């Protein structure tokens, strides 16, 4: 331990009494290299030995964060790290002549930089170059790493909202140099997602790169560019919980109006209340959706549900009118008696009180309302008691006829009420199946 402390003290004394010239040798060599490199250097011209030579630029993009996705204005804001690499023919040296100095870092404004810009930028601000350093190696290789906040146009397709996926392209290319002067190529087949910060609304599926060579109407020479396509899928959990599931529950509640007794007086009120609730959710959905030509999937579901509730409410009103048909109403038509009160009532297990399920009551013919035969005309020649019996029988027959008429009217009223119950049971099954199928179709899209 004492020997180690002795060597440390000796090293400290040597550093203390060394001349400053020895300590700054590397710094002096870097200054000398800088002066030698930039003595006759200009950043205004392409750094190529031959003007006919094409300068190759390699472009690499790292996605760091999705700042904003403005669906209404269709603008995507990203935070990127952009790396550009090229070879400068005038920035090379022999490392042995400069103390094995292999690379230097200098401000990027001092060297020539490719005028690569984002073609589909969505703001009016002029492109600004980041004031970061470039790394220059002894063989002339230049690497420029710069952060950038980009605002690019992105066509948003909301036809499958909230289960939609978007494709947003970022196209980079030279603004003034054609393909014969500057050729840009991507490094690798896709952008890097190693340092990506997860977004709460969007899930990134990838960011493949593709090189294109296009010819524009203004110029005859080709212009190469590199397009990075950002593949996004919306995280739909919040929309499912806040917009979709309430609509599903409400749509399943609407057919239950057919199960309410007609005498409760709440059948129509339930349908109107459900329709108002769907209207409120439709307004909330419209506020969160961008204006578009195509109707989103959830919007179609809302419209289909509102249409179903409207028809169910209208049918409920019709069924209530049938239920409250009075004794003076016409009899149930023969076809309705056979099809609805016969076969359909048996299939739906709608029966009268005391009638077992599955056995329909035989249809009775209307009772005969013929008056009793009149007594022969002329004076009564029978004994007095017989005349009183005939008068009593005549009054009893009249009372029986009135009772039979009242009973027939009551039976007509009961037939209409039974017909209303059959239609209630039938439309309950139909509309509940419709609501269930529509809800399953939408929910399957989330899987």
UniProtKB/Swiss-Prot annotation:
Q: What is this protein called?
A: Neuronal acetylcholine receptor subunit alpha-10
Give the UniProt subcellular location, in the record's own words. Answer: Synaptic cell membrane; Cell membrane
Listed A to Z, the keywords are:
Calcium, Calcium channel, Calcium transport, Cell membrane, Disulfide bond, Glycoprotein, Ion channel, Ion transport, Ligand-gated ion channel, Membrane, Receptor, Signal, Synapse, Transmembrane, Transmembrane helix, Transport
Top-rank taxon, per record: Eukaryota
Topology check: give the Cytoplasmic ranges.
323-425
What gene name is given for the protein in this entry? Chrna10
Swiss-Prot/TrEMBL site (Involved in the interaction with the conotoxin GeXXA) positions: 31
So which stretches are on the Extracellular side? Answer: 25-237
Q: Which residues are glycosylated?
A: 40, 56
| Subunit comment | Forms homo- or heterooligomeric channels in conjunction with CHRNA10. The native outer hair cell receptor may be composed of CHRNA9:CHRNA10 heterooligomers. Found in the stoichiometric form (CHRNA9)2:(CHRNA10)3.
- Residue spans crossing the bilayer: 238-258, 268-288, 302-322, 426-446
- A Pfam family that the UniProt record links to this protein: Neur_chan_LBD
What does the tissue specificity note say?
Expressed in the outer hair cells of the cochlea and the neurons of dorsal root ganglia.
What molecular function terms (GO) are annotated for this protein? acetylcholine-gated monoatomic cation-selective channel activity; calcium channel activity; excitatory extracellular ligand-gated monoatomic ion channel activity; serotonin-gated monoatomic cation channel activity; transmitter-gated monoatomic ion channel activity involved in regulation of postsynaptic membrane potential
Q: Which reaction does it catalyse?
A: Ca(2+)(in) = Ca(2+)(out); Mg(2+)(in) = Mg(2+)(out); K(+)(in) = K(+)(out); Na(+)(in) = Na(+)(out)
Family to which the UniProt record says this protein belongs: Belongs to the ligand-gated ion channel (TC 1.A.9) family. Acetylcholine receptor (TC 1.A.9.1) subfamily. Alpha-10/CHRNA10 sub-subfamily.
